[in-house]
Every structure is written in C-alpha cells, then in structure tokens.
Amino acid sequence: MEPQLTSTTVAGARIELIRCGKGRPILFLHPHIGLEQAQPFIKLLAADAEVLAPSHPGYGESERPKGVTSIDDIAYLYLEMLSDLDLHDVMLVGSSLGAWIALEMAVKSPERICRMVLVGPVGVKFSARDKLDIADLYAIPDKKFVELAYHDPKLAIRDYAAMSEEQLIVVARNSESTARYAWSPYMYDPRLRHLLYRLHVPTLILWGASDQFAPLANGQNYVEAIEGAKFMEIANAGHFPHIEQPEATAAAISAFIQSRSVAAKQKEVA
C-alpha cells in the first residue's frame, strides 16, 4: 500500500498527515529535517500496521496553531489528535527531535501509549549545563552537519536549483520551526529528565553506529534513565537510520514488537 497524503484538523489548525497500512496504530514523529526521504521507511513500517506520520506544526505544509511554541505544546497537540481519532494502545516511533516529542507525550499520557521506539533521541540533557550533549546546528556550517549526521553524506545532498518554489518553502519552514522549538535551550527540555520515572512502557532505543551529531555514548544515558529500555545499534547509519538504513531499522522495530508480543502471551499463559 502506498502512503496517502492527507490532513487532519487539531485545535483549529490543519496538520499535514501521511497515512499508510492497516492494523495497530503507529505514530511516526519525524526529525528536524521533516518527512523528507521518510516514505520508504513508512511503507516498511506499515507492513502490518497503520502508520500515521504528521508534519509537525510549522513543518511541511502543517499550520501552527496560536500558542504552540514548544515541543511540550506539540506533545499536547498530538495527544489531542490521538483522542480526536479515537486511537489507543498507540506505538510511538520518533527520530531525533521526533523522539523528543514522543518522550514528552509518553510522560504526559502513558496510558495511551503501548510501546515506544526512540531513534537517536534528543530532548534530555545529561551533561553539565555548559557542555553540549549534541553538536550545535547553529554553530556549524551545513557541510559539517552532513559529515556528522550521515554515514553516507551523499544521501544528504540537495539540489536547491532543481527544487520547486513549494519545496524550497518547506525547507525554509522546517528550519524556522526547528529554531522556534529547539534553539533555547538547545535541543532539550530541562524538566524532562526528572519526569522519565513516569515511563513504564516497553522502550527500544536505536542509534546509528556512525552518528557523530549525537554521539553513540549518549544512547547509554537514555538506557540508564528509562526503566527497562533496550538498546540496539544500526550499522552503516548516522543520525537518521530510517533514511540511511530503512530496512534494518524497520526490521529492528518489528523484532521488538514480536518479542514483546511473545512475552505478553507467555505471561498470560503463566
């Protein structure tokens, strides 16, 4: 089944939404670069599930409701969206900034979330206040970001001259929205670390083995901070495994789902 581009209205704002597949609901939350290059991964994820992949408020062609100025606000907006769509036992899959949104949603409404996969998450600060946990997007040139964030930098090459005006507007909106939501404090919520005790859903943390934007060692901090979290590296991938290794990333998520399903059935039998 091919992904279908549609939209939904939340808090009076039109939110661009990709839907694909049928089955248990999976909410895919994109990174700061948007839904660009995510469709192959979404199709794989939708093999036996219904995937909903919104463009965050202010990204893509999504409107930004008045008052939505933080990742915290986006989390509440998406929880409202799940309520409007009457979706329960939702699995969250978030990449980078999208993983931050997933964490904020899960600590606010853990009863609505059944599982969570965090791919190269940001949003929680583990180091000292004056030390960066991840590279500073606003202090390095684009070329350096590509070198840090991709195993194969060629995948990040954009031919701006060949882009339509609409595509260029999306690129600009994504960049502007990232600055709005994540510039200060840079890529984290100072309260979030102290709310992780509320997480009791099965959690898998995936990390690109070549990720230098958010160092691999940072993944262990999330594992230690989230009760029962599992950790797995994705080979030949940087900060966006869903783009560089969509098959391996989707397979890891599928195996995680199956392992939890088997464990649940064994518990029922016992």
Regions found by a protein language model. Name each.
Residues 32, 209-211, 236-238:
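Acidic beta-to-alpha connecting loop that harbors the catalytic carboxylate
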Residues 1-14:
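N-terminal cap/lid segment of alpha/beta-hydrolase-fold proteins
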Residues 183-224, 233:
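Conserved serine/cysteine hydrolase catalytic core
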Residues 229-270:
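Catalytic active-site module of serine/aspartate enzymes centered on a nucleophile-bearing elbow/loop
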Residues 52-93, 251:
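Active-site loop/oxyanion-hole signature of alpha/beta-hydrolase fold enzymes
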Residues 11-61:
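Conserved HGGG/HGGXW glycine-rich cap/lid loop of the alpha/beta-hydrolase fold
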Residues 100-103, 107-108, 114-144:
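Flexible "cap/lid" loop of the alpha/beta hydrolase fold
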Residues 127-128, 143-203:
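Conserved alpha/beta-hydrolase catalytic His-Asp/Glu region
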